[in-house]
């Protein structure tokens, strides 16, 4: 079962990147490995309902059940103890990853207020891209009226690219809206 974006990758992106970077083998072309979603909910230490709502929101957005993350150390200034739940995360691979990216690029990011594109400087030096979303309501799966609080999330896109230039070319070929 190939998703729309996966089919686009095989038919359009691979030949374009082979030509641009001079690859001789299609297996050399960088590809997407995984997309990791992380939602830190610091208020979850005091109220369990907040964490349940965050987990439900992320499950709707990702299409799979997230894992609850727990604190590793006690921090008095944050009023948390070792082992307390403080957020949730999920990792998307294969078909769910392509479906999520398709929705992110074509539906969710254009719904962001005053959206001018994502920063092209958010690469880590090894071909991975990280971005943050300030509101979870940009995703079409979230019902605006049922939301108890506006929460942001981190999105990490992991690729097989060796350099940031290759990774940026890969995401740009997917029509990722870069600002610069």
From Swiss-Prot:
Function of the molecule? This is one of the proteins that bind and probably mediate the attachment of the 5S RNA into the large ribosomal subunit, where it forms part of the central protuberance. In the 70S ribosome it contacts protein S13 of the 30S subunit (bridge B1b), connecting the 2 subunits; this bridge is implicated in subunit movement. Contacts the P site tRNA; the 5S rRNA and some of its associated proteins might help stabilize positioning of ribosome-bound tRNAs.
Q: Which family does it belong to?
A: Belongs to the universal ribosomal protein uL5 family.
| HAMAP family, per database record | Ribosomal_uL5_B
A GO molecular function held by the record? tRNA binding
Q: Which NCBIfam families match?
A: PRK00010.1
GO terms for CC?
A: ribonucleoprotein complex; ribosome
- An example of a Pfam family matching this protein is Ribosomal_L5_C
Question: In its UniProt record, which GO terms are filed under biological process?
Answer: translation
Q: Does the keyword Acetylation apply?
A: no
Name assigned to this protein: Large ribosomal subunit protein uL5
Keyword vocabulary terms for this entry: Ribonucleoprotein, Ribosomal protein, RNA-binding, rRNA-binding, tRNA-binding
Tell me the PANTHER family matching this sequence.
60S RIBOSOMAL PROTEIN L11-RELATED
> What's the source species for this entry?
Xanthomonas euvesicatoria pv. vesicatoria (strain 85-10)
Known InterPro entries for this protein? Ribosomal_uL5 (IPR002132), Ribosomal_uL5_bac-type (IPR020930), Ribosomal_uL5_C (IPR031309), Ribosomal_uL5_CS (IPR020929), Ribosomal_uL5_dom_sf (IPR022803), Ribosomal_uL5_N (IPR031310)
The record's note on quaternary structure and interaction partners says:
Part of the 50S ribosomal subunit; part of the 5S rRNA/L5/L18/L25 subcomplex. Contacts the 5S rRNA and the P site tRNA. Forms a bridge to the 30S subunit in the 70S ribosome.
